[in-house]
Design a protein with these regions (language model features):
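Short, basic and Ser/Thr-rich N-terminal targeting/leader segments
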Residues: 1-2, 23, 55, 68
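Short, structured patches in soluble enzyme cores that scaffold and shape functional sites
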Residues: 2-4, 8-10, 28-33, 61, ...
């Protein structure tokens, strides 16, 4: 799941939408990996999204950036199927924009410097297999590319 990630730079509690930028340090690409089999069997997402190598971020943090209308794409370069565009969306189409997300989350938890908030993913998520490569691109930030490896090969 390719997503825009917001990196928090200042402590924030009950941050109103009008002041959301005051707590943001910058933005980066996120690959929100899920183990769908565990997600289905557990009935919730903590373990399915909590493995050590899940949710890579990068390639860097962009501090001078307007997240309101940028493209977010995810490509899967699979051993069996070649390079395929899996997700293509714009942040302008998100159900909840960064100001609303920050206002909501900070209403029940204090945001701390270094916290990362994922903003949601376009349609098109799908399975990945060992040997594949996943590339998440956010227009104006760059591209994050990660290999898919099995748990046995991840050390």
């Amino acid at each position: 799941e390719g997503e825009l990630a917001v990196v928090i730079g200042r402590i924030g509690k009950d941050v109103p939408k009008a002041r959301w930028r005051e707590v943001v340090f910058g933005y980066t690409c996120a690959n929100d990996v899920s183990a769908r089999d565990l997600q289905r069997s557990d009935g919730q997402w903590t373990r399915a999204k909590g493995f050590d190598t899940f949710c890579p971020l990068g390639p860097w943090i962009e501090t001078d950036f307007d997240p309101s209308n940028v493209d977010v794409t995810t490509r899967l370069d699979s051993l069996g199927g070649g390079d395929e565009l899996k997700q293509n969306g714009s942040t302008s189409d998100m159900f909840f924009k960064a100001p609303e997300i920050i206002e909501y989350i900070s209403s029940f938890m204090t945001l701390l410097p270094g916290d990362v908030i994922l903003t949601g993913t376009p349609d098109g998520v799908g399975p990945m297999f060992p040997g594949d490569k996943v590339s998440v691109a956010v227009e104006g930030i760059g591209t994050l590319t990660n290999p898919v490896v099995s748990a046995d090969d991840s050390e």
